[in-house]
Curated annotation (Swiss-Prot):
This is Gamma-glutamyl phosphate reductase. It comes from the Bacteria. Its EC number is 1.2.1.41. Keywords: Amino-acid biosynthesis, Cytoplasm, NADP, Oxidoreductase, Proline biosynthesis. It comes from Xanthomonas campestris pv. campestris (strain B100). CDD domains: ALDH_F18-19_ProA-GPR (cd07079). The gene is proA.
Length: 414
């Protein structure tokens, strides 16, 4: 079956989804969570095959962590589906209503986008998360995962599709692309008359390929080169907490810290404490000359280090003379994802927030809060770094669009 045929079937199934009531979608998602739990042993066995193949290829620890499933993670995926089931349904929400002078009633109403192509790499949880969010918002979803997770993704998709069948919803509403040739992905990205949105999540190469070749609209979930700037007025203990949580709690996450910028006036007090805390968590440090003057046993940082998304226990450090220099550094090397300032100076905090165009800006809070669930969206399909209709963590509302519904009593325009 061609990718165009699969996409057409998904579009037809999306129409069925768009007509489901909120209670029917909630019941469907609850059933999908139960199906994941029922097929848990099958899914974990499939994941073990993917992990074995990845190790044989010499895949790094960060990629292995993103790929790995265990009972706890699988339970977490099922719980996430149940959380999505309980979220308010955005479809049908009236976001604006106005009565015009001629008596017509003008409403803006949320409706599903249609068909969403989700293109991603080694995170099998995305298969379930993306499917749940798209279905809750009344969209069909075409899932194209990476070859590293093909067995895991297939097992998860089959479990979820079984719940669709039981609910008499066409299983094409959740379509997994099993032909992973790049030519097939390219063909999918050309289907502008069928696919309404493509969302790539993964490495820089994948996202560039999608952005350069797609004829459908694309919302990029680009790399997370996230910074913490420790201002001169920062509370040292607070800043160390933000640093350790942001770097070491889950370094493979896109909202983990990659670069630390430290005001010169606090560097002598802050850096030794920070280095001690990070070394306890086995973080490799790389710094500029001013940093190495205080931490002489660390490696030198290069320009490539400051631009890197390590996704590992590695941190680049630079000492800066002032806030403006920190902001210039972030604008040069950052990826518009998430930036953090530790400061007790309200004016500096406001300047930091207003001077950056990043999707998420934090003041005295960990970068790890850059997450849909943590920010009150309930769940997210990813973190958009594209300045379109959605910017930052994308929840259910970002998977809908607003259209006008006009109600009248025979009014005409002369």
């Amino acid at each position: 079956m061609t990718i165009k045929t699969l996409a057409l079937q998904c579009r037809d199934a999306a129409h069925v989804l768009s007509q489901l009531s909120s209670s029917a979608k909630q019941a469907l998602l609850e059933a999908m969570a139960a199906a994941l739990e029922h097929d848990g042993a099958v899914i974990l066995a499939a994941n073990a095959r993917d992990l074995e193949a990845a190790r044989e290829k010499g895949v790094g620890t960060a990629m292995l962590d993103r790929l790995a499933l265990d009972t706890k993670r699988l339970d977490g995926i099922a719980a996430a589906l149940r959380e999505v089931a309980q979220l308010p349904d955005p479809v049908g929400q009236i976001t604006r209503e106005d009565v015009r002078p001629n008596g017509i009633v003008v409403q803006k109403v949320r409706v599903p986008l249609g068909v969403i192509a989700m293109i991603y790499e080694a995170r099998p949880n995305v298969t379930a998360d993306a499917a749940a969010l798209c279905i809750k918002a009344g969209n069909g979803v075409i899932l194209r995962g990476g070859s590293e997770a093909i067995h895991s993704n297939t097992a998860i998709a089959r479990a979820l599709q079984s719940a669709l069948r039981e609910a008499n919803v066409p299983e094409a509403a959740l379509t997994l692309v099993e032909d992973l040739r790049r030519e097939t992905m390219l063909e999918l990205l050309q289907l502008s008359d069928i696919v309404d949105l493509a969302i790539p999540r993964g490495g820089e190469g994948l996202i560039r390929f999608v952005a350069e070749h797609a004829r459908v609209p694309v919302i990029k979930h680009y790399k997370g080169v996230c910074h913490l700037f420790v201002d001169a007025s920062a509370d040292v203990d607070l800043a160390v907490r933000l640093l350790v949580d942001g770097k070491a709690s889950r370094p493979s996450a896109c909202n983990s810290l990659e670069t630390l910028l430290v005001h010169a006036d606090i560097a002598e007090r802050f850096l030794p404490a920070a280095a001690h805390a990070l070394r306890e968590r086995h973080v490799e440090l790389r710094g500029d000359a001013a940093t190495r003057a205080l931490l002489p046993d660390i490696a030198a940082a290069s320009d490539e280090d400051y631009a890197a998304e390590f996704l590992d226990l590695i941190l680049a450090i630079r000492v800066v003379p002032d806030l403006d220099t920190a902001l210039t550094h972030i604008r040069q090397y950052g990826s518009d994802h998430t930036e953090v300032i530790a400061t007790q100076d309200t004016a500096n905090a406001e300047q930091f927030v207003q001077s950056l165009r990043s999707a998420v800006v934090m003041v005295n809070a960990s970068s790890r809060f850059s997450d849909g669930g943590e920010l009150g969206l309930g769940a997210e399909i990813g973190i958009s770094t594209t300045r379109l209709h959605s910017y930052g963590p994308m929840g259910l509302e970002a998977l809908t669009v607003e259209r006008f519904v006009v109600r009248g009593e025979g009014q005409v325009r002369h």
